[in-house]
Amino acid sequence: MKKIDLNADIAEGFPFDESLLQLLSSANIACGLHAGGAKEMQSAVKFAKENKVRIGAHPSFPDRENFGRTAMALSSQELIAHLRYQLGALKAICDGEGAVISYVKPHGALYNQAAKDEKIARVIAQTVYQFDPHLKLMGLAGSLMLCIAEEEKLQTISEVFADRHYMPDGSLVPRSQPNAMVESDKEAIQQVLQMVTKGQVNAIDGSLVPVKAESICLHGDNQHSLQFAKRIVEELEKNHIKITA
């Protein structure tokens, strides 16, 4: 039986966390610098533990104004400090709840920059390794960040997206472009099954891009997204694909 991990961003202030955590195998918990805060983090950790969902840290640039989606030119030392701050905050909450962090997935602009920028990718990988060498680093399948992480002796998780279109080079179509998102549930489900069962995805130019699908990112920031997440779970189970971290 094929297996796949399902992850989503949690503790960002949306009202669907508890419902979403009943569908997921992994939760990317926001660490307060792009959204959410201590209260949301603690609730998310509790819910994740109750539902036996793997916990991941979801650090970002310090950018609450733009939800962490704006690229920032931080020095290496500034980025290290912000990463340590966020990882440390989530670890403290996990320690208090008897839970553990298993992986790190950068958020938004930090995720996208690290996928292509060696300097940023290496700072992230080295900071994570120094914080806890047993943590895994989750990132875009085939990205530079995952290659750098492996060089830095970190285990990695290759991630694919249910609701994003892909460029021919395997990167995501930028949100600034009108065709960035997969709007149709039917198309998104077809894309998920193609990535999980065949290891490939159709790029916007029609070419086939090979992808290593170890975890699927879902979004749950509105009611439609929650219903869509339920449909993804149903389709995976229907195709005998086990959801597990």
Swiss-Prot record:
Keyword Ubl conjugation appears in the UniProt entry: no
Class in the EC hierarchy, top level: hydrolase
Keywords: ATP-binding, Hydrolase, Nucleotide-binding
Listed GO biological process terms: carbohydrate metabolic process
Disulfide linkage: none
Reactions listed under catalytic activity: 5-oxo-L-proline + ATP + 2 H2O = L-glutamate + ADP + phosphate + H(+)
Gene Ontology molecular-function annotations: 5-oxoprolinase (ATP-hydrolyzing) activity; ATP binding
Signal sequence extent: none
EC number(s) given by UniProt: 3.5.2.9
Subunit structure and binding partners: Forms a complex composed of PxpA, PxpB and PxpC.
Role noted for this protein: Catalyzes the cleavage of 5-oxoproline to form L-glutamate coupled to the hydrolysis of ATP to ADP and inorganic phosphate.
NCBIfam families: PRK05406.1-3, PRK05406.1-4, PRK05406.1-5
Family: Belongs to the LamB/PxpA family.
Protein name in UniProt: 5-oxoprolinase subunit A
Source organism (scientific name): Haemophilus influenzae (strain PittGG)
